[in-house]
Design a protein with these regions (language model features):
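Residue-level detector of conserved, well-ordered beta-strand and adjacent loop positions
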Residues: 37, 60, 99, 140, ...
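LysM (lysin motif) carbohydrate-binding repeats in extracellular/periplasmic proteins that recognize
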Residues: 37-72, 109-122, 128-130, 144-161
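Primarily a LysM-type cell-wall glycan-binding module
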Residues: 21-50, 90-97, 101, 125-133
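Short, well-ordered beta-strand segments in beta-rich or mixed alpha/beta enzyme
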Residues: 135-144
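Compositionally biased, proline/threonine/alanine/serine-rich low-complexity intrinsically disordered stretches
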Residues: 1-35, 69, 79, 85-90, ...
Length: 183
C-alpha cells in the first residue's frame, strides 16, 4: 500500500484532533452527565445549574429512570442544555469569573463550597465557539468596568482557592444555560 505524501499528512490533522475541534464548535445538546449521590437533592442541583427550578420537568424528562428515593444509590443523570437569554447588564462591560471548570461535577462541588453564600454567585454553563462548553462560577451580574468588578470582589471575598479572572461579556455567539434574575 502506498503511503500519502508527507505534505498531505501535515495538512490533515489526526482524526482525534479534528474530533476535538468539532466538539468545541458543536452546540451541545446536553450539559453532560452528573452523578447524584444519595442524600443530594435533584431540585437543589437544578436551581443551582439553571438558575431556576423551572427546568426540573425537562431534567426529569431526560431521565425517566430517576428515583426520588433517599435509599437509592448514586444515579447518573443526563442534564439537558436549556438555553436562556442573558440579561442586558451581562452583554456589555465585563463579567467576573470566580472559577472555570471542565465538568459540572467539579463546578458544582466548588459552588457548594460557598455554603450559605452560594446564592450570591451563579453556577453558569457557557458555550463559546472554539472554546466549547465550560462551567463558571460568576458574580451574579455584569460590571460596567474592570474597576467595578474588582470592587465587588473585594467586598465579597471569595475562598482562597478561587481562580478569579475577568471575562468578556455575553455576545451573540455565546450561549448561556443559566437564567439570571438581574436586569
Amino acid at each position: 500500500m502506498k503511503r500519502p505524501p508527507l505534505s498531505l499528512k501535515r495538512r490533515n490533522p489526526p482524526l482525534r484532533k479534528r474530533r476535538a475541534e468539532a466538539e468545541k464548535n458543536a452546540v451541545p445538546e446536553t450539559l453532560g452527565t452528573f452523578r447524584l449521590q444519595p442524600g443530594e437533592a435533584l431540585a437543589e442541583l437544578v436551581r443551582a445549574l439553571y438558575g431556576s427550578g423551572s427546568a426540573l420537568e425537562l431534567v426529569l424528562g431526560k431521565n425517566p429512570g430517576y428515583r426520588n428515593d433517599i435509599g437509592a444509590g448514586p444515579q447518573d443523570l443526563t442534564l439537558p442544555a436549556v438555553l436562556y437569554a442573558p440579561p442586558p447588564s451581562m452583554t456589555k462591560g465585563v463579567l467576573l469569573s470566580l472559577g472555570a471548570f471542565g465538568t459540572l461535577e467539579e463546578a458544582y462541588t466548588a459552588w457548594r463550597g460557598y455554603g450559605k453564600r452560594s446564592p450570591s454567585v451563579a453556577l453558569t454553563p457557557i458555550w463559546r465557539p472554539g472554546e466549547g462548553l465550560s462551567f463558571h462560577i460568576l458574580a451574579p451580574r455584569g460590571f460596567a468596568s474592570e474597576r467595578a468588578a474588582w470592587s465587588w470582589l473585594s467586598r465579597f471575598s471569595p475562598p482562597a482557592e478561587a481562580s478569579v479572572r475577568l471575562l468578556s461579556p455575553f455576545d451573540g455567539a455565546c450561549l448561556v444555560f443559566h437564567k439570571f434574575t438581574v436586569k
